[in-house]
């Protein structure tokens, strides 16, 4: 058993897709929210659940204009210098045509080394295996419904599909693995599944620490599951189940990888945001160690006039400022020097380097005059909280 960062652990080699996710080098392509399984532990947000919309990380894609959607997808991948893409949902195979076209476009744009892995649960038409492989899919991850874990052979619609995909892996066409949540109390069923995978020499299985989210907590609590601690959304005893399954199958042919909830947030997501912050930072912004961007903001009725006054009075160059709707965006290290002389609200704004520019913290720098005119539109502040991380494109969700 090898201990990995943030409470994760593994026996066997780390899957390629996981290594790239750990480096923050994977874009998350959410193809569709459609899925008929209604798993009680599903953490998907209400906005995405059963929606036919697509997202590349936090960027919503309008697939009614496919070319524009594919162009936006590529732009998002470039925003983090992505070395690969994880395709998820819902279930991407509810829209296999869209999924195949997206894979082809990614490979055509970034080349064969752009690693693409895909999560799927449904027993889809076996013909799509060839289509996915020909499009360039590198890694196929099956997410079997929990009712199939105890006796996989009793569910031939699934088993046939999995074994056919394994034949293609044996022919050197791609990698095949599995991914399931560690449901407390399910160690017997999970162990049976891992034993079946080992008997057929499947490459790996990822065991995800089960988590509470805004959309699943009622269903989880009603089934008796409890939160492990007050600082995270982890389910009590989920990790212990993973350790027991690993103990039973130590030395087996199938890699068993436990991916903890803190790992997804503290390592995987943080690394991805840091890559985006580095590439998206404007001259007047500071990229932080947390993967956020900090800028100065002045709220005012006439940003162009405000910029002209600042340039004249404080000798601030044009590259250190930008006019926005009802605001001047400015280098925070410069704004700090003269914020007290500005008659309008001035503050530091910390935001995620994402398409939505989610603001996570605001630090006031002055006390503007009570009669200072304000812009008609005020920017809402969104406090930093774990629930928002589910909006930030975590692979596998």
What residue ranges belong to the model's regions?
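Radical SAM enzyme core and accessory elements
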Residues: 1-9, 279-397
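Canonical Radical SAM [4Fe-4S] cluster-binding loop centered on the CxxxCxxC motif
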Residues: 2-8, 13-65
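Short, acidic/turn-prone active-site loops that include or flank metal/cofactor-
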Residues: 144-149, 210-211, 349-354
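Canonical radical SAM enzyme core domain
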Residues: 52-71, 93-137, 143-157, 180-192
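Hydrophobic faces of well-ordered beta-strands that scaffold small-molecule active sites
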Residues: 26-29, 85-87, 114-118, 140-142, ...
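Conserved C-terminal portion of the radical SAM core fold
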Residues: 160-267, 283-291
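Conserved mixed alpha/beta catalytic, RNA-binding, or beta-rich assembly cores of soluble enzyme
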Residues: 33, 48, 65-72, 81-85, ...
């Amino acid at each position: 058993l090898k201990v990995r960062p943030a409470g994760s652990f593994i026996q066997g080699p780390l899957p390629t897709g996981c290594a790239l996710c750990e480096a923050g080098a994977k874009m998350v392509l959410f193809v569709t929210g459609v899925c008929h399984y209604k798993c009680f532990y599903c953490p998907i947000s209400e906005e995405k659940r059963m929606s036919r919309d697509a997202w590349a990380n936090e960027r919503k894609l309008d697939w009614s204009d496919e070319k524009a959607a594919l162009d936006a997808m590529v732009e998002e991948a470039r925003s983090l210098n992505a070395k690969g893409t994880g395709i998820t949902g819902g279930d991407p195979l509810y829209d296999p045509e869209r999924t195949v076209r997206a894979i082809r476009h990614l490979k055509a744009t970034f080349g064969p080394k752009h690693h693409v892995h895909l999560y799927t649960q449904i027993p889809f038409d076996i013909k799509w295996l060839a289509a996915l492989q020909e499009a360039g899919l590198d890694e196929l991850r099956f997410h079997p419904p929990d009712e199939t874990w105890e006796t996989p052979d009793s569910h031939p619609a699934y088993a046939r599909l999995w074994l056919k995909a394994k034949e293609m892996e044996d022919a050197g066409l791609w990698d095949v693995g599995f991914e399931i949540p560690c449901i407390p109390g399910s160690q017997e069923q999970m162990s049976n599944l891992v034993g079946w995978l080992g008997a057929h020499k499947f490459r790996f299985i990822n065991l995800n620490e089960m988590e509470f989210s805004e959309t699943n907590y009622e269903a989880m609590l009603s089934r008796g599951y409890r939160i492990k601690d007050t600082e995270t959304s982890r389910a009590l005893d989920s990790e212990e189940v993973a350790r027991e399954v690993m103990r039973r199958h130590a030395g087996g042919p199938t890699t068993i990888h436990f991916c903890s909830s803190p790992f997804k947030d503290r390592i995987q997501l943080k690394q991805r945001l840091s890559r985006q912050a580095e590439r998206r930072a404007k001259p007047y912004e500071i990229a932080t160690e947390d993967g956020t961007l900090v800028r100065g903001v002045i709220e005012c009725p006439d940003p162009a006039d405000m910029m002209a006054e600042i340039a004249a009075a404080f000798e601030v160059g044009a590259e250190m400022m930008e006019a926005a709707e009802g605001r001047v965006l400015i280098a925070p290290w410069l704004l700090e020097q003269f914020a007290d002389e500005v008659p309008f609200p001035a503050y530091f704004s910390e935001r995620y380097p994402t398409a939505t520019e989610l603001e996570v913290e605001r630090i006031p720098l002055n006390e503007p005059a009570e009669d200072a005119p304000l812009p008609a539109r005020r920017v809402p502040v969104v406090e930093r909280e774990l629930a928002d991380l589910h909006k930030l494109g975590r692979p596998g969700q």
